């Protein structure tokens, strides 16, 4: 027998050997040990002890040899050892033991002996004595044979032992736990009618190893203890305590009434979940709890768990090999407590107990409800009411007196379902709970929100008060794009319900949201929207004092403080633009204007926020007026004086001209502006002269000419003559009383006559008026006499738009004076003016006009399209409106618009104009690629188009084809047309719901060739094998340069024949798509492009050759991402087939994408031609290659493979079950997880589903929360139904909150929601049912039950196979068949319904309720043999690493202790293809090639980018004039007034922002621990608050830079792998250093290698955050960064606690809250110990070591430390023992395997 084996230069412990601990120190000379004794520990273990020799010696040699022969195994021990345990012995084998003391090179005589375990057992007393023998130091482990105390009380008990089986214990220490349990069980009288003992083991998820009623004898229990398997996982003690509370102390599990109930917990670490509520539940239900902690257990936590007093119920030992020291004390205490409880139970046996009944909830509010119950029987001391949110949270409780039967639960969360349990508390026991649920109401919200008193920068908000609210939160933000983030909030007290929001932006729409606050909780919001007022422009513009070169502007000010005004005015032709800014005044003169010019005015108010919209107006300056007074006096025979009055200071000069009336020379003189008279001399006597006067202004313009006639005196005349002529010539008289006669103030029915009185002797004036047309003799219309002192008269009523001649005659006492006449004209009936158009869009526009000067009653607007027939439309608006938005117009259409003013006398003349909507249509529409049966329409896109409707119509038979394409499309092709036919192609542009007019062209298809008549090709008939084909088939054709035109046509012919073999094309059959690939793939047509074989084949014939390089990998990815999509027509549940044709090696990688697609269920056929790489084809094609890979020598050899390819493709497409890739092989079946969207890339879109860690923490699973009701239409999943034989496979687990009622794990419903087939789980009855309909239409079910079925309901992951055949149904659980039952052959299903997961059986209809559970795998395999081949590799307890594939990101830990390098390995194979190299330097220019042939014309290039916008500014539109003759090209139009900056428009109103929520109180976070199998989640924990960053640990020595690794995974996985790698490396190195120290007899001080905490499991995808809870304890420190190679030994760090990240909580997203309080400082992680040094005081740390050489790059791995348990320690060989060290109180060495 071999105990040690030398390898290289180190002594290493063999796998079956443990470490010997040392106990005593004896000094003296070398002498032999004495008193060699043996003590049996178990059936394969023995303890050897001896007395140390006297004198000085260095150590011992322990030799163990099988007597029957075999290798002697030797172990060197230190001189302090006096005992050792040998394990792994054969009970029937005789062994010789020798113990030799030595000192340097001298040895003592051996102390030796022989033993056989069976012989030693026979000598033992079969009944151990009750008396306990004190062993002094107590370090000796007790064995069942050594137990001296046996509980002999007649009292019995139900004892449930809960054992921690987490990774931190390790397999080695778990053996010591078994020894402890064996000793514990031995102390009691165990039997079915005596004390019963059950046991559960827990880690991530608890499991029952055996129930209380599982065994009937003590021997059976002890045998079960010895065979107890080690579980492994995380430490979730709270979950485990709750598990035994719900499962172990139940009658069905063997628990008895009237019997003491004892719970014993054994754990080695701090729990990663909350232990207080489950411990309290157990204690209050009558279970007395004992807690035994080992090593890193938390004493405070043990005290929280155990019953009182702590001194007798809490035990804690430092190491596992010291557990035997507490056996006696524990068993004594248990025995005495059983006796005491038995007496108490018997004393109260006559008392009546029971739970309360009739749980009723009432008075439900948002924060409370009342709970009522009927009293429990007997003498109830108190009632305990426990309540907690169903979706997770910390339980609360209320304790009331036993006389009370109701209580109000307060401070609840609103709109939350609560679980309620009421327990009756008796003197010595507690009843079962009376349970129920209730949901609180939603918090009352504010109502009647009113936004009012809106100004430019403020508004008031008002709402009705909410009873009970503690305050209100108001959020408000602008909706304008670009300002949405400028959100503000306001918190106010509960007494305020009317507030003002100030500081707002003008002319901006705001959304205002009000929340009622109840403490930190908020109600639902009430929201309103309102727009602030625009900045007020000035009002009521008035233009006065308009002259020829000036005018005055007057306006009313705005209602608020402004900074000033900006005035802009310009003339009509845009040559004169002026701008001036003025102070806050209300009038301003304009000067320096041009006479007779139209000016446009715009006045802006200027505020701090900007400027307002303009107040506009238009006016025209007057012409330079004629002189209204011209007088001739001082007349002589040769001269007279001309006198006038200047009209303005701007008159520059006067030009005076005169000429004899009867002919003669005109003379003139230019006079200065200050002159107002001039004497004309040198005239002829008695001659009549015409005198003219005009003013010449500074700008060169001239006034109208004023004329007067004067006659010089004859030589005999002496009295002067005077003539006054206003604008017309008047005969000179010598007496007149009138001058400056003016007719003005025109209206439509009146004129005012004014004159100056020049003679005070006038008694009266006679005013006569008549129309100016007609005969001069016509009759006077009217005569009015006025006094001589009156100088004006209003003439009315007159006719509108009529010219009148008014004559005023002065009347003297002696007769009439000279009459003076003047014309006047009434105004026409006034109508609107200045029609303007704005806001033009594709279906609307706005018209604006200026009101007429005369009063109106309203306006009538009439409009009609110009070029298309249609009704005339009209509308009416009030007198105060001068603008209207006309809607529902046609796009790009001219409309005639007429506006009539409604006046008292009727309608005015119409203001007419032509307006036009914007054109919603394409441009540059052309027909291209015109063939005999096809053509393509090309156009230039419209910038606002969202879609195009393209229509082609035959002008012969009026047949139409129509398609709708996207707004970015520039072409569309039509096929199946008639040759030599005229077609009209129309494109309609669509903008959302608006459709523009068609843009059309005519095109004629090509004629049939007239040379040899040809006939349309015969459509190939479908082949028999393809009659049932139904698939989505994509052909990928290599279009690279190496193929060429001729060979490409051969490929097209091959495709034509292959597709022709198909039967039905379209959604009811096979859909075909085509991609041509080179550098960039190009879609020739999509899967849903063609519905008939004829059109499909025609499209194939017209595929053109592309040319380029070969990028096959890129093309395959393109096909997956672009063509296998819903938009392209991909159907769910239909086989996906790809056929790749290529003639060369790809210039990119094809392996990865091909593998991914094969794993996703795609069937890929690869066809290689000529120079194609066969190995690459094998990588591309699916397996087996014999069916999926083809190769031909040239392009003429396609016929050789055509039939075989068609057969294989059609067989793949005809299968009811598509091909899926599972566990490395291709199978026919359905990947149901993918079909339900339960995969990593899709699950976030499935409502009610979250991703959680699954088995091994490396597989994802998906938690279906309550009422998630995940479903999919059957036609997507199983369009052809189910096969006759199939296997349904699930990997799932039941959760604590999974209801007790039956639910369908999976079922198919028809369109009436009737179940057709499915699997039912009854969590309450612990049964499994499968049902379907048989072929005769009868409903049939089979139900399975029993112990093997029940275990799937206990919270662990289990694998379930249901094998359905034509005669029976088999159930296989965890790869073990547990039952089968006969069943008739099933009928096929209909595909008109849905398939659902988790639907409650009692829930009817398409909706309803569903149960929560976790699902990791769900497949349907179309075979009955799959269950026999499955190895359950996903289950930790059944996984065989040798036959199972590697776990994702896994690594293996070496089982040898060798540290020396092995021999060089054989040369490696060829490496992977390297990455693409950098671009090389350009090579030298090659010789010129021959001139190529002229190529075909290239396609038309895309339209160029739109040019920049012009800088001109639109002017005010003028009045429409009469249509004139076509003129020459005019000059650029005038500029308009620059408008104010408009506020940006907005898109749609965004949804309201959710309320920032309160800071959620944190639940207790679990500390990081080793990765393990996740357990059944309990009530989800609540996120803890973040603590401050812990102090950094000391840095390690940096390692050498490694090679570039492969792309990493998510950050959390990378961190886990990095930390795990450190754990393994550090522990191996320290392990080896410790071995070296021991075997070379180097004394060493105690140097514990402490447990390194394992990394946390990979975080799941975030679920919806749970409801906020209370503040939890501080979180544990996170992992430090990656370490380098080990540095010098560090100080021993504090022992960390183990744990892992908890699963995400379940629930809807809570509102945002403020930051939580800071947590306590974290701890640094202990450093890795270095190798031990020689004895002596601790020296200073050494310098950093030189970094080692760069190691080779490895594949990315994931090292689970738990799998590296105890390096170098394997299970014992049947023929070899293993040693278990015994630790004394002296020198101790701790050795822990990685991950322990």
Curated annotation (Swiss-Prot):
Keyword field contains RNA-binding: no
Domain VWFA residues, every copy: 158-330, 1032-1205
Disulfide bond listed as a keyword: yes
Biased composition (Low complexity): 1473-1482, 1573-1585, 1741-1757
Disulfide bonds: none
Domain Fibronectin type-III stretches: 32-122, 355-444, 445-536, 537-626, 627-715, 737-829, 831-921, 922-1010
Domain Collagen-like: 1462-1510, 1514-1570, 1571-1609, 1653-1705
Biased composition (Pro residues): 1728-1740
GO terms, biological process: cell-cell adhesion; collagen fibril organization; extracellular matrix organization; homeostasis of number of cells within a tissue; regulation of cell growth involved in cardiac muscle cell development; ventricular cardiac muscle tissue development
Pfam family of the protein (one): VWA
Entry superkingdom: Eukaryota
Annotated glycan sites: 94, 137, 372, 1384, 1388, 1476, 1485, 1523, 1526, 1601, 1698, 1701
Chain ranges of the Laminin G-like domain: 1229-1424
List of residues that carry 5-hydroxylysine: 1476, 1485, 1523, 1526, 1601, 1698, 1701
Molecular-function GO terms, alphabetical: collagen binding; extracellular matrix structural constituent; extracellular matrix structural constituent conferring tensile strength; protein-macromolecule adaptor activity; RNA binding
SUPFAM superfamilies on file: Concanavalin A-like lectins/glucanases, Fibronectin type III, vWA-like
Region (Nonhelical region (NC4)), start-end ranges: 1217-1458
A single cellular component GO annotation: extracellular matrix
Compositionally skewed regions (Basic and acidic residues) per UniProt: 124-134
Chain positions covered by the region annotation Triple-helical region 2 (COL1): 1654-1779
Protein's name in the database: Collagen alpha-1(XIV) chain
Organism: Homo sapiens
């Amino acid at each position: 027998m071999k105990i040690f084996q030398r390898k290289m230069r180190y002594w290493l412990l063999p796998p079956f050997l443990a470490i010997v601990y040392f106990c005593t120190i004896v000094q003296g000379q070398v002498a032999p040990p004495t008193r060699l004794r043996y003590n049996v520990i178990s059936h394969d273990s023995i303890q050897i002890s001896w007395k140390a020799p006297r004198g000085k010696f260095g150590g011992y040699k322990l030799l163990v040899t099988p007597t029957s022969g075999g290798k002697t195994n030797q172990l060197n021990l230190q001189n302090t050892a006096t005992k050792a345990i040998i394990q792994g012995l054969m009970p029937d084998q005789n062994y010789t033991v020798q113990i030799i003391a030595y000192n340097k090179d001298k040895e003592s005589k051996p102390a030796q002996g022989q033993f056989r375990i069976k012989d030693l057992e026979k000598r033992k007393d079969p009944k151990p004595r009750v008396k306990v023998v004190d062993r002094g130091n107590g370090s000796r482990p007790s064995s069942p044979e050594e137990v001296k105390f046996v509980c002999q009380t007649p009292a019995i008990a139900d004892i449930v032992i809960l054992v921690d089986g987490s990774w931190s214990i390790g397999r080695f220490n778990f053996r010591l736990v078994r020894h402890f349990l064996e000793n514990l069980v031995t102390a009691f009288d165990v039997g079915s009618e005596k004390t019963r003992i059950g046991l559960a083991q827990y880690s991530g998820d608890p499991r029952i190893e055996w129930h209380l009623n599982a065994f009937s004898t003590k021997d059976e229990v002890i045998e079960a203890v010895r065979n107890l398997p080690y579980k492994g996982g995380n430490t979730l003690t709270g979950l485990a305590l709750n598990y035994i509370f719900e499962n172990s102390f139940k009658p069905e599990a063997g628990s008895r009434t009237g019997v003491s109930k004892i719970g014993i917990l054994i754990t080695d670490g701090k729990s990663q979940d909350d232990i207080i509520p489950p411990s309290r539940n157990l204690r209050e239900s009558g279970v007395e709890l004992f807690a035994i902690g080992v090593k890193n257990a938390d004493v405070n936590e043990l005290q929280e768990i155990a019953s009182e007093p702590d001194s007798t119920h809490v035990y804690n030992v430092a190491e596992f090999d010291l557990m035997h020291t507490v056996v006696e004390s524990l068993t004594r205490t248990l025995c005495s407590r059983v006796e005491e409880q038995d007496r108490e139970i018997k004393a109260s046996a006559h008392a009546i107990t029971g739970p309360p009944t009739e749980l009723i909830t009432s008075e439900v509010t948002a924060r409370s409800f009342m709970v009522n119950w009927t009293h429990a029987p007997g003498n109830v001391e108190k009632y305990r009411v426990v309540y907690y949110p169903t979706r997770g949270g910390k339980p609360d409780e209320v304790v009331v007196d036993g006389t009370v039967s109701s209580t109000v639960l307060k401070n609840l969360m609103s709109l939350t379902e609560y679980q309620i349990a009421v327990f009756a508390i008796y003197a010595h026991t507690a009843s079962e709970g009376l349970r129920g649920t209730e949901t609180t109401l939603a918090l009352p919200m504010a109502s009647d929100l009113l936004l009012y008193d809106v100004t430019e920068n403020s508004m008031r908000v008002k709402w009705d008060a909410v009873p009970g609210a503690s305050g209100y939160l108001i959020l408000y933000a602008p909706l304008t794009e670009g300002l949405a983030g400028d959100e503000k909030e306001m918190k106010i007290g509960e007494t305020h319900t009317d507030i003002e929001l100030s500081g707002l932006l003008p002319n901006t729409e705001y959304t205002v949201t009000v929340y009622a606050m109840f403490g930190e909780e908020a109600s639902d919001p009430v929201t309103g929207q309102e727009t602030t007022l625009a900045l007020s422009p000035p009002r009521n513009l008035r233009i006065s004092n308009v002259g020829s070169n000036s005018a005055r502007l007057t306006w009313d000010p705005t209602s608020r403080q402004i900074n000033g005004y900006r005035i802009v005015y310009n003339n009509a032709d845009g040559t004169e633009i002026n701008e001036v800014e003025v102070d806050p005044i209300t009038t301003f003169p304009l000067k320096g204007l041009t006479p007779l010019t139209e000016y446009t005015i715009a006045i802006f108010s200027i505020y701090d926020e900007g400027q307002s919209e303009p107040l506009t107006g238009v006016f025209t300056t007057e012409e330079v007026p004629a002189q209204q007074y011209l007088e001739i006096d001082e007349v002589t025979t040769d001269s007279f004086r001309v006198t006038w009055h200047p009209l303005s200071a701007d008159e520059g000069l006067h030009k005076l001209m005169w000429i004899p009336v009867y002919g003669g020379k005109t003379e003139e003189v230019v006079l200065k502006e200050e002159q107002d008279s001039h004497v004309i001399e040198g005239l002829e006597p008695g001659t009549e002269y015409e005198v003219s006067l005009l003013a010449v202004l500074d700008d060169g313009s001239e006034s109208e000419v004023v004329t007067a006639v004067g006659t010089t005196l004859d030589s005999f005349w002496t009295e002067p003559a005077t003539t006054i002529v206003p604008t017309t010539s008047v005969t000179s008289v010598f007496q007149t009383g009138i001058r400056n006669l003016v007719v003005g103030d025109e209206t439509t029915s009146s004129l005012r006559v004014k004159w100056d009185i020049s003679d005070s002797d006038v008694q009266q004036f006679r005013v006569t008026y008549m129309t100016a047309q007609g005969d001069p003799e016509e009759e006077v219309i009217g005569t009015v006499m006025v006094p001589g002192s009156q100088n004006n008269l209003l003439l009315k009523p007159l006719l509108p738009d009529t010219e009148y001649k008014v004559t005023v005659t002065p009347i003297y006492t002696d007769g009439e004076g000279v009459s003076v006449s003047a014309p006047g004209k009434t105004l026409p009936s006034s109508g609107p003016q200045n029609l303007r158009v704005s806001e033009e869009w594709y279906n609307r526009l706005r018209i604006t006009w200026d009101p007429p000067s005369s009063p109106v009653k309203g306006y009538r607007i009439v409009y009609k399209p110009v070029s298309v027939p249609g009704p005339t439309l009209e509308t009416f608006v009030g007198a105060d409106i001068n603008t209207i938005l006309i809607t529902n117009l046609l796009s790009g259409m001219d409309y005639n618009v007429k506006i009539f003013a409604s006046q008292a006398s009727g309608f005015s003349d119409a203001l007419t104009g032509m307006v036009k909507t914007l054109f919603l249509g394409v441009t540059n529409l052309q027909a291209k690629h015109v063939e005999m049966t096809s053509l393509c329409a090309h156009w230039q896109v419209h910038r606002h188009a969202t879609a195009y409707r393209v229509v082609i119509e035959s002008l012969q038979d009026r047949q139409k084809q129509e398609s709708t394409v996207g707004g970015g499309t520039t072409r569309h092709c039509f096929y199946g047309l008639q040759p030599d036919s005229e077609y009209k192609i129309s494109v309609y542009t669509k903008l959302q719901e608006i459709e523009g007019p068609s843009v059309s062209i005519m095109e004629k298809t090509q004629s049939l060739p007239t040379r040899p008549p040809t006939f349309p090709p015969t459509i190939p008939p479908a082949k028999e094998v393809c009659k049932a084909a139904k698939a989505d088939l994509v052909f990928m054709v290599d279009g690279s340069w190496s193929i060429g035109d001729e060979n490409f046509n051969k490929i097209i012919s091959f495709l034509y024949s292959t597709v022709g073999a198909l039967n039905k094309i379209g959604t009811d059959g096979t859909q075909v798509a085509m991609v041509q690939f080179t550098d960039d793939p190009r879609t020739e047509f999509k899967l849903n492009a063609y519905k008939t074989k004829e059109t499909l084949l025609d499209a194939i014939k017209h595929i053109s050759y592309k040319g380029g390089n070969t990028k096959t990998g890129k093309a395959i990815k393109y096909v997956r991402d672009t063509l296998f999509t819903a938009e392209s027509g991909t159907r769910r549940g239909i086989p996906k087939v790809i056929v790749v044709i290529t003639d060369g090696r790809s210039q990119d990688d094809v392996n990865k994408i091909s593998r991914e697609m094969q794993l996703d269920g795609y069937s890929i056929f690869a066809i290689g031609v000529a120079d194609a790489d066969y190995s690459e084809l094998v990588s591309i094609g699916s397996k087996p290659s014999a069916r999926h890979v083809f190769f031909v020598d040239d392009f003429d050899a396609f016929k050789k493979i055509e039939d075989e390819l068609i057969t294989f493709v059609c067989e793949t497409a005809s299968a009811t079950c598509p091909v899926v890739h599972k566990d490395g092989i291709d199978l026919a079946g359905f990947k149901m997880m993918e079909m339900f969207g339960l995969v990593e890339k899709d699950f976030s879109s499935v409502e009610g589903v979250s991703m959680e860690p699954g088995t091994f923490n490396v597989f994802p699973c998906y938690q279906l929360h309550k009422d998630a009701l995940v479903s999919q239409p059957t036609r997507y999943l199983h369009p052809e139904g189910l096969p006759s034989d199939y296997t349904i496979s699930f990997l799932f687990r039941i959760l604590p909150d999974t209801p007790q009622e039956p639910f369908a794990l999976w079922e198919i419903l028809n369109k009436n929601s009737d179940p057709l087939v499915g699997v039912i789980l009854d969590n309450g009855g612990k049964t499994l049912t499968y049902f379907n309909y048989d072929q005769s239409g009868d409903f049939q079910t089979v139900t399975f039950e029993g112990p093997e079925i029940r275990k799937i309901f206990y919270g662990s992951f289990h694998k379930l196979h249901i094998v359905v055949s034509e005669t029976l149904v088999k159930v296989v659980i965890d790869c073990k068949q547990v039952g089968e039952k006969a069943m008739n052959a099933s009928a096929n299903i209909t595909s008109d319904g849905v398939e659902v997961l988790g639907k409650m059986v009692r829930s009817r209809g398409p909706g309803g309720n569903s149960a929560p559970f976790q699902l990791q795998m769900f497949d349907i395999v179309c075979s009955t043999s799959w269950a026999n081949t499955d190895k359950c590799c996903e289950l930790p307890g059944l996984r065989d690493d040798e036959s199972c594939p590697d776990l994702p990101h896994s690594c293996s830990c070496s089982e040898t202790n060798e540290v020396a390098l092995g021999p060089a390995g054989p040369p490696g194979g060829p490496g992977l293809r390297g990455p693409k190299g950098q671009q090389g330097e350009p090579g030298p220019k090659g010789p010129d090639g021959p001139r190529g042939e002229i190529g075909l014309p290239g396609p038309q290039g895309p339209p160029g980018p739109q040019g920049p916008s012009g800088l001109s500014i639109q002017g005010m539109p003028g009045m429409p004039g009469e249509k004139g003759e076509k003129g020459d090209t005019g000059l650029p139009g005038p500029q308009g007034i620059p408008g104010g900056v408009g506020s940006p428009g907005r898109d749609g109103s965004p949804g309201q922002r959710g309320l920032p929520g309160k800071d959620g109180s944190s639940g207790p976070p679990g500390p990081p621990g080793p990765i393990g199998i996740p357990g059944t989640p309990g009530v989800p924990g609540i996120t803890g608050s973040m603590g401050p960053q812990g102090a950094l640990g000391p840095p390690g020595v940096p390692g050498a830079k490694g090679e570039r690794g492969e792309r990493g995974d998510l950050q959390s996985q990378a961190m886990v792998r990095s930390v795990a790698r450190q754990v393994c490396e550090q522990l191996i190195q320290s392990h080896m250093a410790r071995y070296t120290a021991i075997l070379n007899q180097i004394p060493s001080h105690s140097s514990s290698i402490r447990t390194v905490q394992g990394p946390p499991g990979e975080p799941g995808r975030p679920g919806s955050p749970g409801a906020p809870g209370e503040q939890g304890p501080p979180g544990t420190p996170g992992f430090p960064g990656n370490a380098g190679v080990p540095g010098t030994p560090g100080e021993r760090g504090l022992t960390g606690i183990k744990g892992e990240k908890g699963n995400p909580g379940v629930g809807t997203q809570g509102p945002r809250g403020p930051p939580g309080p800071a947590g306590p400082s974290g701890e640094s992680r202990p450093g890795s110990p270095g190798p031990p040094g020689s004895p002596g005081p601790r020296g200073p740390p050494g310098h950093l070591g030189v970094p080692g050489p760069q190691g080779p790059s490895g594949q990315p791995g994931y090292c689970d430390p738990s799998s590296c348990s105890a390096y170098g320690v394997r299970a014992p060989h049947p023929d070899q023992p293993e040693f278990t060290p015994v630790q004394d109180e002296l020198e101790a060495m701790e050795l822990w395997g990685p991950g322990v």
